[in-house]
């Protein structure tokens, strides 16, 4: 039993260290897409309607939020977005939520159950997630009015407007 606890504990610590190094490397070296044009995508919303990035943005700055229903940190960021969405829209910034590889029924049930009134696109095949080099969730991409990626964060910072200029 002691051996199981010892090796089990070591496995947990090793996993935590590897995850920390992965995120630190992402933050230290930056995302290779910063400064580049945001990749165009076509995704469906929860009602099955297709949307493209350019169709939603219409030349405005945008915040892309990659998330998943199973992610506890994503849930807290969804709550923040839900509270601030009107203020963000008043500033002329579009918010695009992209759920990672889950079905629209599952996502809709989650949104309804949690009283979230945000528009969601679903990346069921993972292509958009791959195009945006998502290291983990939650991940926010800040896209300027010119369509270039300005910053990548794992939370919605208070100074998000500065990141978009």
Q: Which ranges hold each PLM region?
A:
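Conserved redox-active cysteine motifs that mediate thiol-disulfide chemistry
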Residues: 66-83
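Short pre-active-site segment immediately N-terminal to redox-active cysteine/selenocysteine motifs
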Residues: 60-62, 67-70, 136
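N-proximal helix/coil linker or "cap" segments that precede and/or mark the start of modular domains
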Residues: 6, 14-40
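A short beta-strand-turn-helix
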Residues: 42-62
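Hydrophobic beta-strand anchors of alpha/beta hydrolase catalytic cores
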Residues: 63-64, 95, 140
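Thiol/disulfide oxidoreductase modules built on the thioredoxin-like
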Residues: 58, 109-116, 123-165
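Solvent-exposed loop/turn segments at secondary-structure junctions
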Residues: 68-72, 101-105, 126-128, 156
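Conserved segment of the thioredoxin-like fold in thiol-based oxidoreductases
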Residues: 76, 86-125, 137
């Amino acid at each position: 039993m002691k051996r199981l606890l010892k090796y089990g504990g070591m496995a947990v610590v090793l996993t935590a260290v590897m995850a920390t190094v992965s995120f630190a490397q992402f933050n230290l070296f930056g995302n290779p897409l910063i400064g580049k044009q945001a990749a165009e995508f076509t995704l469906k919303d929860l009602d099955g309607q297709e949307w493209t990035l350019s169709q939603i943005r219409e030349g405005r700055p945008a915040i892309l939020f990659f998330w998943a229903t199973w992610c506890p940190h994503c849930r807290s960021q969804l709550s923040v977005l839900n509270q601030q969405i009107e203020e963000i829209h008043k500033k002329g910034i579009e918010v695009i939520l992209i759920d990672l590889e889950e079905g629209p029924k599952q996502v809709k049930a989650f949104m309804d159950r949690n009283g979230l009134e945000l528009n969601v696109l679903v990346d069921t095949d993972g292509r958009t997630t791959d195009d945006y080099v998502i290291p983990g969730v939650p991940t926010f991409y800040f896209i300027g009015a010119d369509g270039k990626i300005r910053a990548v964060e794992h939370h919605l910072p208070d100074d998000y407007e500065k990141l978009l200029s």
